Amino acid sequence: SHVATDNYAGGVEAGKLMGKLLHGKGTVAIISYPALQSVVARVDGFKKGLSDTPDIKIVAEQPGITRAEALTTAQNIMQANANLNGLFGFGDDAALAAVIAAKSAHNDNIKIIGFDGMKEARDAVDSEKTFAAVIRQYPDQMGAKAIDAAVDHLNGKPVEKMIPVQPGVYTGK
């Protein structure tokens, strides 16, 4: 069995939330990592979540694998799109880098959404105006479901090939 976050569902939640945060209109960018299937699922989900808001345009989708690369990517995107309204980072490092880029671009109104939910990102959602939300993964639930599946298998019960864990949304304390 493969126990993992439902990355597509998390992306859909991020896209829907971005649509609400931008009141259905504006421009957004995506920092991605197209070599990873989990990230492709997140980005595809994000686009699906935005599909109900046709007045939001995706103006850039560029890779930024490490935090340093994501910072350069975010800076380049914001320089080319001075009035960028939103940015989806495929992971917390990409989103945290985008927060720094937004500060240096003096863009206090951009809405940034990340994905993973590590403590540093949740703290930044609490303290940074531009970091609007993070899609949270739940490794404790993944571990519990993996143990349950292993026990079921050892007891001769059928086990699903894929066991998705639904992500959550963190928008602050």
Residue ranges and their predicted role:
Residues 1-173:
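A residue-level marker of the well-folded mature domains of exported/periplasmic proteins
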